Amino acid sequence: MLKKITFSVFTLLLFSHCAQEKSDIRVVCETIPGGNYVIKWETFPPMKGTVMIYESSLPDSFNLHSPLAEAEISKGFKDISFQTGKRNYFKLVFNKKYSVVTAERVIPMQGLFNFRDLGGYYNAKGKQTRWGKLYRSSSLSRATLPDAKELNDLGIQTAIDFRTDKDRLSAPSKYIPSQTFPYPLRGNAPFVYADRILSKKMKAGDVKVYAQDMFSFLLENNSDYFMKMFDLLLDENNYPIVIHCNMGTDRSAVAAALILAALDIDMGRIVNDYMLSNQLIDYNAFIAKDSPFMQDSEIQETFTALLRVHKRAITYSFDKIVKEYGSMDNYFNTALKLTAKKREKLKEIMLY
């Protein structure tokens, strides 16, 4: 189900601003056939010297006395033949001075999809979201036994389930961490528009408007649940945390965008994370071949467009917030009671 993601896309997603100098370091970590890794980097302006690479199964703990590999910075990449059977994190130290932590953003699962780590995003001050702290996913009701093992290995302590009460009852989570919090965000799911699509009253061109309205509705009508979410995020004992909904494309997407915005991640990177879902999900897999949605090309196009995420949905919704509140800072402080002091605490937990 997972589509191959190009280096250029991940370069955007893993853009790293080095706070110590006026250079930028861009790093990407990918798996290659055989389960090994290739780590690629670029430095701006070009940097000479040596990069040392360290490995750990823990995102915040590296043995810097024993490098896994080293390479000339000018080479730009290093193949890593290394397998532990667990998730691996890598710390790159450039010229014994500048360091960047990286890992694979997307974690392949058997039943779950759209599962990814929200680490590795940089804000304007050069602070990086911590790897291994916060994940977003499709519904945990899709978890298989191998998925459950993977989630255990990730050390997941808390799940925040944004699905409706009806969805949770009809499809209970198959992975239950130490604590689960049901926060059923208000708002329509795409599937409620099935009849309008089948009758061709909703066309593909209408979907972007629907997506804008849905995203805005979620933001405007769930402040109580978002406040509860941030309260959980402000307690370091709750981590690692996974947030999930049905497909991980709407409710979880809104929540992830808010969290990244609260950490001062710029809108470009927030949009890139949001749009990544389109590369991780085979939307046609959700439409049975004998489904009425497959009997007509126009209907199929509209329904597929409805399932996809659209850039304008998130930019429109955040622009609307800024227009109403004057700034995202005012929105967090007024609508979500997330004061500057609380945001600083959140940054202490979520950034390094």
Task: State what each model feature region is.
Residues I5-L14:
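Sec-dependent N-terminal signal peptides
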Residues G248:
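Substrate/cofactor-recognition hotspot
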Residues A19-I241, A255-Y352:
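Cys-dependent protein tyrosine phosphatase-like superfamily
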Residues C245:
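Short cysteine clusters
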